[in-house]
Amino acid sequence: MRGGIGNMMKQAQKLQEELKKAQEEIAKMEVTGESGGGMVAVTINGKHEARRVSIDPSLFEDDREMVEDLVAAAFNDAVHKLEQESQQRMAGLSEGMNLPSGFKLPF
């Protein structure tokens, strides 16, 4: 029995280290979201901070509200992509751990 608890503690410690490493990797990631068929692109990092915004010059000839909407849509697309990538990386950590059904990482 004692060995089982010790192994479980080692496994939990290893998971904690892997989780920390994955979070650090995610924080360094950059993803780009697009809208308007690529006419607007927003790049964010893993901390959801905007790093770059690119707007096709032809959009400045159109109305301002449309450009604002496209920037917001591109930012939201980038956030969605970051969340998907984060979930995929975290899912790999829980494989083979016999976690209860519905139990997800991070804690």
From Swiss-Prot:
Any signal peptide, and if so, which residues? none
The entry lists its GO molecular-function terms as: DNA binding
TM region(s), chain numbering: none
Which keywords does this chain's UniProt record carry?
Cytoplasm, DNA-binding
The record's annotation in Pfam families points to: YbaB_DNA_bd (PF02575)
Recorded superkingdom: Bacteria
CC per GO annotation: bacterial nucleoid; cytosol
Q: What is its main location?
A: cytoplasm
**SUPFAM superfamilies the record matches:** YbaB-like (SSF82607)
Q: Where in the cell is it found?
A: Cytoplasm, Nucleoid
All disulfide bonds of the chain are: none
Subunit annotation: Homodimer.
Could you tell me which HAMAP family the record lists for this protein? DNA_YbaB_EbfC
State its role.
Binds to DNA and alters its conformation. May be involved in regulation of gene expression, nucleoid organization and DNA protection.
Similarity-based family:
Belongs to the YbaB/EbfC family.
- Name under which the protein is recorded: Nucleoid-associated protein Mlg_1509
